[in-house]
Regions:
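A contiguous strand-loop segment
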Residues: 1-72, 100-104, 200
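Cysteine-dependent hydrolase recognition
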Residues: 30, 45, 51, 71, ...
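C-terminus-biased signal that marks the final domain/tail of proteins
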Residues: 79-252
Length: 252
């Protein structure tokens, strides 16, 4: 399971900017791009071979590791999700990209055509990536930073939304509290809402279910909460979504 929590100025996004639109792809993977109409590239996406990709900001004082010259990271993520066949081919594309800004990435893959149980953790591969023009660091759960605020947890790769230690609630402490029973409802009710992260877009990708739970901010809703992490999430069955026929234009 993967959580992508976009934090931005949620007051500026109107309800008309997130709509369903399907475009036919005959020579590449079908994929779902979770973002906004008019946003070029990807910030969170998932394709029909169960590869998922998302990002969060990577704040670093080492300014020399970034560049404004190259392929914007949103374009790179879009290419990866459309053309990568596996987590290995996705890594190759990311390594060879003309990288620019520094971002944290989460890259996952579900091995759906295996003989193991559907809920077997061995069916899921997931990596955390520090991505920038001059640095590219890959972390499995065993390689994650191991500190008091950021403990290593088996089969869990995570980036804290806040610099630790700080007065902000740490993601690590919440993961420890709920470890062993972390599912999409638990993440939505007890983790992202407590951290108050994902105010513009909050997306939980469940690889076992082949489903996405997603919520957007709603600045035009006079009654409900504005922030995405506080709103009701919509569950999308990705197998059914990818099977939806492409709309046709009536020549008449």
């Amino acid at each position: 399971m993967t959580v992508y929590h976009l934090n931005a100025s949620y007051e500026g996004y109107a309800k008309h900017f997130h709509q369903y639109y399907k475009q036919p792809y005959k020579t590449t993977h079908t994929f779902a791009n979770f973002g906004y109409i008019g946003l070029i590239g990807s910030i969170g996406a998932y394709n029909d071979v169960s590869i998922g990709l998302g990002q969060k900001v990577w704040i670093t004082t080492e300014q020399d590791i970034t560049s404004r010259l190259g392929n914007p990271w949103t374009y790179v993520l879009r290419d990866v999700i459309q053309f990568a066949d596996s987590i290995d081919s996705a890594l190759t594309m990311l390594v060879n990209a003309h990288r620019t800004c520094s971002v944290h990435l989460g890259l996952g893959e579900y091995h759906r055509n295996t003989s193991g149980r559907e809920d077997d953790d061995d069916n899921v591969g997931f990596l955390g990536i520090e991505y920038s023009a001059k640095e590219f660091n890959v972390f499995a759960w065993e390689d994650m930073y191991n500190t008091t605020q950021h403990p290593v947890l088996e089969n869990v790769v995570y980036w804290d939304p806040y610099v630790q230690p700080s007065n902000n609630t740490c993601l690590g402490s919440l993961l420890v509290e709920h470890y062993g029973r972390i599912d999409a409802p638990t993440v939505i009710r007890n983790i992202t809402s407590v951290l108050k992260t994902g105010n513009t877009l909050n997306m939980v990708l469940d690889y076992n279910e082949n489903a996405v739970y997603i919520a957007y901010s709603a600045p035009e809703d006079p009654q409900g909460p504005i922030e995405a992490f506080n709103r009701v999430h919509t569950r999308i069955d990705m197998a059914k979504l990818f099977a939806e026929p492409v709309p046709t234009i009536d020549d008449e």
